């Protein structure tokens, strides 16, 4: 099914609007990382107890990505986007009104449902809406939207929360989503479902050892990162003894470094994806091991955050490129699985960080995170040696 030809300007506008949507969806997933202390204070809870919200959100996305993708596989994509945006916006209004922690968690589950569907269809939609011959750039734009959520979305969300209260942050995200929805309604044509894959494509994907090995690598390395990253805001304030303002600056540095990672990957990713991902995982190991020693100084923490931000962006982009290259015949199913597996890692990391903080010491989150990071490094070296060509991006 082809889309009626439109001017390149309109085609790019459609892709840019999708990238803005990607920015909003990722901002809301990560913004609680910068608001944990404030939310805990307003509900008279410990920060580590509130952190369980991150795990619940991530695991709902993980569990629901594939079922929702299959349930909606025959649904016209424009209508599906409108429905999931309405759910997303309504859930943010509930977050804003949340009168206790349980209601806040319920609102986050609603957002996670919308998130699960959005990420399983977005990559293939961007490819369909892109101007002729600009598929790679369209995907790169979506990845940029995702990256900017870490760079700008999370720190801005934290600043808004700091000065106007965490509820205002969620309300603002909901309003941003409403404006984006109105743009999508105006810009998008009808988009009949295509190339979405079905349950039939699952056994096919499971029989691809290179792809399955990548999924294992994804869950292990993401668990490592989020063990420490989920609690970086309370770590900076409670362990390092630094100010709330510096915690905001650090999140900004960490996110901003992601842009450098994105540029590095854009330049070298097509030819050297395997080497780049391996180097980035090694860099992540070093950053996690040095997190506590670096906590003695603002400058050391800032420098460490630059390398940490570069590493995690290269890892994320590298995985995405490889998954799409290994499953061109079932992009939606492969990306739904990837999104699910990525979120299993986020939830697992946040849970490990939560348990370490509650039952041991928050100061140990870097060391504990380094354990799965080391395992990921060994696994990456092994699988990239076994499938050196298969795992490079293939032209399709």
Swiss-Prot record:
Keyword Ubl conjugation attributed: no
GO terms, molecular function: carbohydrate transmembrane transporter activity; transmembrane transporter activity
Record-linked Pfam families: MFS_1
Localization of this protein: Cell inner membrane
Any one of the GO CC terms: plasma membrane
Topological category with respect to the lipid bilayer: Multi-pass membrane protein
SUPFAM superfamilies for this protein: MFS general substrate transporter
Cytoplasmic side: 1-14, 71-80, 124-135, 190-208, 267-274, 322-332, 385-396
Primary localization: membrane
Transmembrane segments: 15-35, 50-70, 81-101, 103-123, 136-156, 169-189, 209-229, 246-266, 275-295, 301-321, 333-353, 364-384
PROSITE patterns: MFS
Keywords recorded for this protein, A-Z: Cell inner membrane, Cell membrane, Membrane, Sugar transport, Transmembrane, Transmembrane helix, Transport
Record-linked CDD domains: MFS_NepI_like
GO biological process, one term: transmembrane transport
The UniProt record lists the keyword rRNA processing: no
Coiled coil regions in record: none
InterPro entries according to UniProt: MFS, MFS_dom, MFS_Efflux_Transporters, MFS_trans_sf, Sugar_effux_transptr_put
Superkingdom: Bacteria
Residues in the Periplasmic compartment per record: 36-49, 102, 157-168, 230-245, 296-300, 354-363
Its job: Involved in the efflux of sugars. The physiological role may be the reduction of the intracellular concentration of toxic sugars or sugar metabolites.
Record family assignment: Belongs to the major facilitator superfamily. SotB (TC 2.A.1.2) family.
UniProt-recorded name of the protein: Probable sugar efflux transporter
Species for this entry: Salmonella typhimurium (strain LT2 / SGSC1412 / ATCC 700720)
Gene that encodes it: sotB
């Amino acid at each position: 099914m082809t889309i009626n030809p439109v001017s390149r300007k309109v085609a790019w506008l459609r892709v840019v609007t999708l990238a803005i949507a990607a920015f909003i969806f990722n901002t809301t997933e990560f913004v609680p990382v910068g608001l944990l202390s404030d939310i805990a204070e307003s509900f008279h809870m410990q920060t580590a107890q509130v952190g369980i919200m991150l795990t619940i959100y991530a695991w709902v996305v993980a569990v629901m990505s594939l079922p929702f993708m299959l349930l909606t596989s025959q649904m016209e994509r424009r209508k599906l986007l409108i429905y999931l945006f309405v759910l997303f916006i309504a859930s943010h209004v509930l977050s804003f009104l949340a009168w206790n922690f349980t209601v806040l968690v319920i609102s986050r589950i609603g957002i996670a449902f919308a998130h699960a569907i959005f990420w399983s269809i977005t990559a293939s939609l961007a490819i369909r809406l892109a101007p002729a011959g600009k598929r790679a750039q369209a995907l790169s734009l979506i990845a940029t939207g995702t990256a900017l959520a870490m760079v700008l979305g999370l720190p801005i969300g934290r600043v808004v929360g700091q000065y106007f209260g965490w509820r205002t942050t969620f309300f603002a995200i909901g309003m941003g989503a409403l404006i984006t929805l109105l743009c999508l309604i105006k810009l998008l044509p009808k988009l009949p479902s295509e190339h979405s894959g079905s349950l039939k494509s699952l056994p096919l994907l499971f029989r691809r050892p290179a792809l399955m090995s990548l999924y294992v690598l994804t869950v292990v390395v993401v668990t490592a990162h989020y063990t420490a990253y989920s609690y970086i805001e309370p770590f900076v304030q409670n362990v390092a003894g630094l100010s709330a303002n510096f915690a905001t600056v650090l999140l900004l540095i960490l996110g901003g470094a992601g842009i450098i990672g994105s540029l590095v990957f854009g330049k070298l990713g097509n030819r050297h994806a395997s080497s780049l991902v391996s180097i980035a995982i090694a860099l992540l190991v070093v950053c996690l091991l040095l997190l506590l020693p670096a906590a003695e100084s603002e400058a050391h923490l800032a420098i460490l955050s630059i390398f940490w931000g570069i590493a995690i962006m290269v890892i994320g982009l590298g995985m995405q490129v490889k998954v799409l290259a290994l499953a061109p015949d079932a992009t939606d199913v492969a990306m739904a699985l990837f999104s699910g597996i990525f979120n299993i890692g986020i939830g697992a990391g946040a849970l490990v960080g939560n348990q370490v903080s509650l039952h041991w010491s928050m100061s140990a989150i870097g060391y504990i995170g380094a354990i799965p990071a080391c395992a990921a490094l060994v696994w990456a070296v092994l699988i990239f040696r076994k499938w050196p060509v298969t795992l490079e991006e293939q032209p399709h």
